[in-house]
Amino acid sequence: MEYVKGILLAILMISFLSINAQVRVDSHIVFKDTVYQFGSVEEGSDAECVFSFINKGKTPFAITNVKTFCGCIDLRWTKEPVKPGQSGKISVKFYASNPGTFSKTIKVFTTDRGEQSIDLTIKGSVSIKPGKE
């Protein structure tokens, strides 16, 4: 009986090691910053920032989608595959229309198997336009 347990344990360990090897990550996206603080933005104006990233892995990856859950943000990003050692960017334009503080999340989806998605955040406050008070 102990012999059978030993065989089963060996099979389980080999299975675990082979599964672990299959999910090895060869591409890896690294962002310089994942949060951008705008500070104070005047109501009715646009604020822009850029999130830069680099491929620190061994194989190319691509950004498959970038989503936000707010109509106040316009997004542009590197569409071509990013080779190892190369960099890319995601440009963000925020339309400041409602006075008050804001914190908006941007979800980045890539072919990097090590990441489900990456969250980027923009923060700040929208000040009331002078003369509108």
Predicted features along the sequence, with ranges:
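Surface-exposed binding patches on compact interaction domains or structured appendages
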Residues: 58-86
